[in-house]
């Protein structure tokens, strides 16, 4: 038995020795030796073993472990140092980028040569190379065809190169491939920028906070910053407020902000008015891009949420999002404004909200050859205060820098340069009209004079008409992804066309050809609006009605102005009994809109019964009517006579004086096969359709000698 106990005790003793901790004296001497010699030889380890009472093997392992520990400590320290240096360099890089934006050349006092200059040089070289290649291919084609090969003129916009002269005289020519007239909606799909990095988030949050503070100061500032200019606003005042740029620069001074290139135009405006919606509901509209586009189809042609930076707890308060937006004035004659910006929503106190916008430069876009932004939104937004009876008081501030790289179309030059095209009064007027329409949509009852329409049918009809208006407005954009071709011809009417493959369930499937032209008329906006929306005068301009009268079957009002309504029209001709026309007319202090689309009777019955109208295909056409913005006219940059006071009188947008800029737009289904070709005859047909419509409108309004086209 003793024989078995002894090995057990010796094993336990070895285990205790294996995990034996060194004494403080042993550790002190080992550390001292390690400082002198981290790699002791065998003799040194033997001497330490005798002095400390440890085995040589223990000495060897201790030094190995100590060297490994020191190496790990050094690596951690180096990593921390390199990480700090990396963060420091990145911050310095960002600061240098910001400084370069505002640096001033000491010689000429202007900005230095930027990356866009070198990008322009590269593009010129690439264009020269492509021109040589085109000339070479043209020569080869001429030899093959045995006749000269005609090219389009150099001024033809990009992505619209074609060997076919799209003129009225081009009837019976060869078919035109679909890709040669490329619309934006079915071309290259829109690519959102990448989400915000962790490095960018705090910077954007700081920018949004500063923008919010500046917005509140601007919204509450007095006459020292805001000056009154003639024209009136949506609230019925005698003048509208524009920003005094010099005073603004002195108060909100920014590095290099005193210098602006001659091509940069500053637009600043402020407007206040009552809106039929609560402050909380308005904040939700502003922070939801889908609702944002639905409320402002006449201004916002496209909007996307790139990233949600801060998701407010318990509502929209303290929410921060990064947005992309395209702004337009519903004509292909003026390019859209494309803006990346952060939107900050904050509840300041009970019943008072603030929405602040400010542009951000997404530097990562520059690596993919994206052009520098032409539009830059400075701190803008609105203050929203709850009032009685479901109303809110909105103070809107719009502040933007725009670089005009190409001449503005002569018809819209006064309207754009005055700041009225995208000013605060236009935003607020559109918001007031949209809120009235929404209140009519959610109202439970139906006016007693609307016979045969149920509340469900009314809502269904309003939703269908809203989709029609949104589709029409978005089809008029002129962005990089949605470009138009100007038709050549001897006629004075300059028609722009584009086409796309339609696969949207809300549109007919196939090839859709869109055409539009803009004209100036020496007639007040409200007169033009009343003429084109009235079913009694429709036969005077509607070519497709062949001079036959139309009758209004039903009308649904959607605002306090009688001009804001939805109508179902029916032709009195026996051949038109199977089709109806859905029409919505909209007007506010900034302009007017008349949109219509054919709809068959079975589809109309589906809508009137209250069923879902989302699958009913529509191909809308219509008119946009804007004041010409000429100085001194009552229909200038903003118009007071068509505000809420004029609404009771039934006046349209633009007031009772001055001229109008009218855009006429048609969409036609060329073929129900998406892969089909477009024949020049189809282009000539729509060209003739627009030309005839324009001439008939001018004749009916007694201004045949005054029409002017871009």
Swiss-Prot record:
GO terms for cellular component: nucleus. One of its GO terms (molecular function) is DNA binding. It comes from the Eukaryota. Gene3D superfamilies: 3.30.530.20, Homeodomain-like. It is found in: Nucleus. Keywords: Coiled coil, DNA-binding, Homeobox, Nucleus, Transcription, Transcription regulation. Residues 197-440 form the START domain. Residues 15-74 bind DNA. CDD domains: homeodomain, START_ArGLABRA2_like. Residues 82-144 form a coiled coil. Residues 14-23 have a biased composition (Basic residues). Signal peptide: none annotated. Residues 1-23, 630-650 are annotated as: Disordered. The keyword Transmembrane helix does not apply. InterPro entries: GLABRA2/ANL2/PDF2/ATML1-like, HD, Homeobox_CS, Homeodomain-like_sf, START-like_dom_sf, START_lipid-bd_dom. Residues 630-648 have a biased composition (Low complexity). Belongs to the HD-ZIP homeobox family. Class IV subfamily. Probable transcription factor. This is Homeobox-leucine zipper protein ROC8.
């Amino acid at each position: 038995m003793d024989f078995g106990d002894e090995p057990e005790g010796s094993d336990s003793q070895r285990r205790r020795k294996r995990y034996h901790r060194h004494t403080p004296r042993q550790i002190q001497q080992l550390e001292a030796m390690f400082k002198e010699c981290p790699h002791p030889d065998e003799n040194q380890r033997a001497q330490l073993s005798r002095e400390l009472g440890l085995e040589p093997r223990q000495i060897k392992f201790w030094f190995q472990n100590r060297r490994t520990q020191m190496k790990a400590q050094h690596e951690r320290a180096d990593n921390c140092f390199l990480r700090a240096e990396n963060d420091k360099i990145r911050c310095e890089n960002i600061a240098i980028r910001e400084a370069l934006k505002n640096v001033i050349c000491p010689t000429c006092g202007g900005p230095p040569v930027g990356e866009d200059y070198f990008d322009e040089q590269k593009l010129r070289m690439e264009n020269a190379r492509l021109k040589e290649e085109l000339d070479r291919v043209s020569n080869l084609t001429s030899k093959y065809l045995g006749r000269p090969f005609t090219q389009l003129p150099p001024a033809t916009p990009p992505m619209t190169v074609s060997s076919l002269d799209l003129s009225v005289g081009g009837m019976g020519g060869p078919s035109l491939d679909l890709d040669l007239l490329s619309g934006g909606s079915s071309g290259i799909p829109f690519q959102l920028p990448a989400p915000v990095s962790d490095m960018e988030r705090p910077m954007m949050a700081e920018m949004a906070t500063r923008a919010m503070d500046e917005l509140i100061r601007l919204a509450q500032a007095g006459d020292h910053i805001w000056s009154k200019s003639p024209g009136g606003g949506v609230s019925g005042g005698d003048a509208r407020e524009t920003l005094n740029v010099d005073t603004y620069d002195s108060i909100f001074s920014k590095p290099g902000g005193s210098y602006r290139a001659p091509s940069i135009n500053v637009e600043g405006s402020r407007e206040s008015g009552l809106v039929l919606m609560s402050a909380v509901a308005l904040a939700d509209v502003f922070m939801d891009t889908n609702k944002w586009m639905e409320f402002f189809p006449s201004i916002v042609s496209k909007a996307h949420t790139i990233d949600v930076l801060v998701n407010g707890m318990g509502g929209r308060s303290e929410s921060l999002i990064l947005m992309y937006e395209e702004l337009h004035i519903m004509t292909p004659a003026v390019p859209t404004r494309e803006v990346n910006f952060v939107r900050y929503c904050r509840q300041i106190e009970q019943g008072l909200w603030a929405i602040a916008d400010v542009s951000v430069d997404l530097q990562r876009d520059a690596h993919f050859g994206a052009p520098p932004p032409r539009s830059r939104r400075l701190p803008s937004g609105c203050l929203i205060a709850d009032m009685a009876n479901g109303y809110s008081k909105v103070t809107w501030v719009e502040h933007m820098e725009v670089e005009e790289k190409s001449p503005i179309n002569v018809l819209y030059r006064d309207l754009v340069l005055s700041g009225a095209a995208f000013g605060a009064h236009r935003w607020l007027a559109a918001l007031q009209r949209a809120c009235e329409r929404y209140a009519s949509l959610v109202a439970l009852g139906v006016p007693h004079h609307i016979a045969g329409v149920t509340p469900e049918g009314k809502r269904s009809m309003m939703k269908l008409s809203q989709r029609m208006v949104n589709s029409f407005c978005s089809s008029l954009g002129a962005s990089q992804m949605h470009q138009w071709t100007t038709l050549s011809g001897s006629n004075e009417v300059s028609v722009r066309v584009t086409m796309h493959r339609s696969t949207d369930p809300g549109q007919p499937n196939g090839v859709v050809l869109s055409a539009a032209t803009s004209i100036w008329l020496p007639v007040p906006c409200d007169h033009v609006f009343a003429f084109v929306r009235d079913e009694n005068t429709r036969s005077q301009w509607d070519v497709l009605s062949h001079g036959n009268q139309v009758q209004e079957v039903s009308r649904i009002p959607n605002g306090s102005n009688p001009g804001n309504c939805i109508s179902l029209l029916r032709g009195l001709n026996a051949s038109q009994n199977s089709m109806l026309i859905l029409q919505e007319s909209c007007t506010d202090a900034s302009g007017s809109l008349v949109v219509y689309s054919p709809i068959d009777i079975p589809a109309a019955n589906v809508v009137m019964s209250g069923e879902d109208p989302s699958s009913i295909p529509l191909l809308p056409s219509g008119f946009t009517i804007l004041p010409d913005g000429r100085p001194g006219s009552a229909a200038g940059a903003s118009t007071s006579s068509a505000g809420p006071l004029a609404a009771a009188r039934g006046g349209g947008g633009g007031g009772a004086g001055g001229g109008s800029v009218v855009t006429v737009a048609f969409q036609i289904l060329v073929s129900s096969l998406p892969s089909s070709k477009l024949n020049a005859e189809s282009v000539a047909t729509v060209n003739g359709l627009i030309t005839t419509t324009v001439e008939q409108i001018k004749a009916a309004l007694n201004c045949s000698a005054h029409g002017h086209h871009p």
